[in-house]
Amino acid sequence: EGTVEPTNLVRVDNNLSEEELKDGWQLLFDGKSMSGWNGTNSKKEPDGWEVADGLLSGFASGNVILTESVYDNFELEFEWKLKKGADGGLFFHVPSTLSLTEILNFGPEMQIIDDQYHPDAAVSNSHVTGAVYDILPPRYVISKPIGEFNHSRIVVSGNNIEHWLNGIKTLKYELNTDIWSQNFNNSLFRENSNFGKSQSGHIAIANQEGQLWLKNIRVRNFLGQ
């Protein structure tokens, strides 16, 4: 099983090719609107988010957006960049009724952070981009400099999760295993017995601090293991 993706062809931002559509990909951001995304409690105009210049931007700290659709087994790809000192994250299988604070404590977070300038990234190797926040570190720290777009991919298949960053598989883990439990029991979330137990729900992207920009967000469902 490879750990490196083939080089992406030049693409038109926020569009899918006929081949991608045939392969089951769905666009989650059209470059023009918030269509397909809500705030918590299905709020149609999420606080702290806007669309400008073909980018979906979280411009105010402490806000989250969730997909209108729910997913169980899926593959998600997106490109992102950060303002200096910013901190965000991606979550999956999230109920629509949770606040950002509740989402942060609900299940695994694929960390997105300024690895160079945000102090939290220096606290632990499980706090850097591509980590499962405070639980598992990535094999590599390969985020691009501030102002450049990164390409992230997450694959969720049952209890098996993969994190990819800029074409490299940086982390592969399985929920509800001895290794997972050992790391979880040493984490900030160890008192939460329901952490990571959900099998279906919304995909959520949080802007916890600063500002982040997103584009080319796409998802496809597949049958799990």
Feature annotation, model-predicted:
Residues 1-225:
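Carbohydrate-interacting regions of secretory-pathway proteins
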